[in-house]
């Protein structure tokens, strides 16, 4: 059975943890759609277009991965794109409660979608976009946390 997965997120910026999840998902699913959310609830460092551009650049090496802009509810995009799986990452137990609530809401809105949770590789379990931005603001080492292109964009942005 060929299954398409959608992986939504703000990706402000995309991290090595995000990329690890996409890489692993690309080995499981026929195709993975990375959906960059506008997300009016968050104050982002990077613009919508910049986040989309970084995701496209970083993930271009994965042949069965597409990056789209998410301009409506994820479940609506999933239905239109015939994605059967909503992919979510769980770094810690603290993520679990929110993600289960979101999963139940998504399934209520689109009974054809299932949420699948992947935990990150241990070396990425503590990485978040917020922490990465803080490290960049303090001119810390970013090489192990983000792609070179993202590091360059971060350094330019936080000067």
Language-model-detected regions and their locations in the chain:
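Nucleotidyltransferase catalytic core that binds NTPs
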Residues: 1-159
């Amino acid at each position: 059975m060929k299954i398409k997965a959608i992986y939504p997120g703000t990706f402000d910026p995309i991290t090595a943890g995000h990329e690890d999840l996409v890489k692993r998902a690309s080995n499981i699913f026929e195709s993975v759609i990375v959906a960059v959310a506008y997300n009016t609830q968050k104050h982002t460092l990077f613009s919508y277009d910049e986040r989309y551009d970084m995701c496209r650049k970083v993930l271009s090496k994965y042949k069965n991965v597409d990056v789209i802009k998410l301009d409506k509810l994820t479940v609506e995009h999933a239905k239109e794109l015939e994605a059967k799986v909503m992919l979510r990452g769980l770094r810690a137990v603290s993520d679990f409660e929110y993600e289960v609530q979101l999963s139940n809401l998504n399934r209520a809105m689109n009974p054809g979608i299932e949420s699948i949770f992947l935990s990150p590789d241990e070396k990425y379990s503590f990485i978040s976009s917020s922490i990465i931005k803080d490290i960049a603001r303090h001119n810390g080492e970013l090489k192990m946390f983000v792609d070179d292109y993202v590091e360059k964009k971060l350094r330019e942005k936080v000067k």
